[in-house]
Amino acid sequence: MNITLSWRHGRRRGLAALFSAAALVAGSVVATAAPAQAADESITVNFSVAGGSPTYRASGWIYGMTENGANPPDNYFTDVKFRYMRAGGAQLDSPGGWVSGKYDRRWNATRAQLLRTQSLGGQFVLLVHDLWGADGYPISRFPGDNGNWADYDAFLTRLIDDVRATGAPAQGNTVQWDLWNEPNITLFWNRPQSQYFEMWKRAYQRIRAAFPSHLIVGPSFAGVPSTGGWWTQYLDYVKANNVVPDIVSWHSLPGDPVANVATANTTLDSRGIAHARPYQINEYGASNEQNPADGAWYIARLERAGADGLRANWAGGSNLHNDLANLLTHNSSGQYQPKGEWWVYRFYGSQTGQIASVTPSSNYDAFATKTSGTAKILLGGGRTTGNIAVNLQRLDTTSGIVQNNQVRVLVERIPYNNGGAVTGPVTVSNTVATLSGNSTTINLPHTAVDDTFTITLLPPGGSTPSPSPSPSPSSTPSPSPDSSPTPPVGGACSATIETTNSWPGGFQSTVTVRAGSAPVDGWTVKWTWPSGQSISSLWNGTQSVSGSSVTVRNADYNGSIAAGSSTTFGFTANGSAATPTATCTSP
């Protein structure tokens, strides 16, 4: 799919509402002015003002998981404290979906991604319109054409039954229902507004009756809240008809979540519409804002606004269903590699304890946390370059960091690398600072507008933290014949462990599970660690541990292996690298 939209010119994060088709339209163009240059600014972090614990509200994506739900590997999700996946089979069999008689493939992909999201501890946001087929292609019909709702009712019956068959109970917030994406633009809703309102009411009532505790999301508006026009017309309708969504949503492409939330509060409060749950900005980050600096800025602003965020996805075709919404890339061998912005989310995912207060500047904001023995600051920008003075105040209110009026300051830069793979943050400085009045100032030379910085505070005598590195490029584990050890006979299976990367105190391994001369339907792999190793993260399987013994069973999506073929799962582990002998059994 290759549709180019016309966008309003403006600087990044201009507050005007912009039309969007993120995640669903490849080749969209955002025209922006060049970023400002050399604007020295300062921000302040006050550690005496502490908020709650981080909830990683910005760690969600729209699409970014393979069609079968198998990839990317688990660690790329768990390392960033993944919270949300928003999907519904867009672009599969295009034109596809219910209206084209091709619902099944889109539903099968949605089901696989839903189950994988839940296995990773995330919340799945179901895009109903994509399953219908309204993903940017001209389609033959919309719900309620010519006053006939029979076809849409049949579609909802099928979808409700399919969701129920996944095991999602009527009670329990296991699925969020996003009824229609960007209904205020003709790319996705090419019918009168009144017909959309009737569709909303019918879908809302059907889903509420079938799943009383599932949350309904909307309107997923193409733009940001405003005090008039389509936004307020929608609010007036849902209020008058008692079909107010559980979670109010919009898109920030670009936009400022803090300003958007203030406007949303004004428009909902004036109508007496309760909004007890956080707003959901379920597409944020225009295509030219997907870099470490802008990504970190959106994280800081979402946290400041108290809104949940799902990062937009500007890929198309098969790339839409992969690469964690463009946070990852592939090398020539098809192995996953993280981009610079993935490292931003990884640092964000490592921030624990209590949230500290930050006073932003006009172009920079930050997210800061403190816990015993460390404090961390993720800096966001993306609009200008120049020196950034980060004023750290009331360090006496931290725990286990300041010793003899000194603190160690580790500054790292996360490079954009023109959107290519990034092996990790780059150390800028690692020094011991002497405090003055329980404070110190760190000056950051911001010369590349798309790069960003992190600051880690440690006790002065402490060593530089060395978290387990991200797994080196990891292969796509899909069942395929290869030239590994001779397969076993009959319906049996074999398993081979291979160390693919190692570092001080840890390693990564891939386990190949191979069927014999007959297909395998379900497998279990077991081994025993020789010297105290332990798994820190595992993907494409489900593990259980008893002492040094490890048992891994297949995931829902990779238990069936054709005769003579194989699948893989992988893990990272603590301890010295080891390749114990593994056994495989099949029911």
Give the positions of each predicted feature.
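Secretory targeting and sorting signals
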Residues: 2-38
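Boundary/entry segment of secreted carbohydrate-active catalytic domains
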Residues: 39-90
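Substrate-binding cleft and catalytic face of glycoside hydrolase catalytic domains
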Residues: 80-245, 249-256
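Glycoside hydrolase catalytic-domain groove-lining segments
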Residues: 246-292, 350
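Aromatic/acidic polysaccharide-binding cleft in carbohydrate-active enzymes
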Residues: 289-376, 380-382
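Carbohydrate-binding surface patches
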Residues: 362-416, 504, 509-517, 521
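C-terminal beta-sandwich/jelly-roll accessory domains of carbohydrate-active enzymes
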Residues: 383-473, 531-535, 542-551, 558-561
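Extracellular low-complexity, O-glycosylation-prone Ser/Thr/Pro/Gly-rich "stalks"
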Residues: 450-451, 458-587
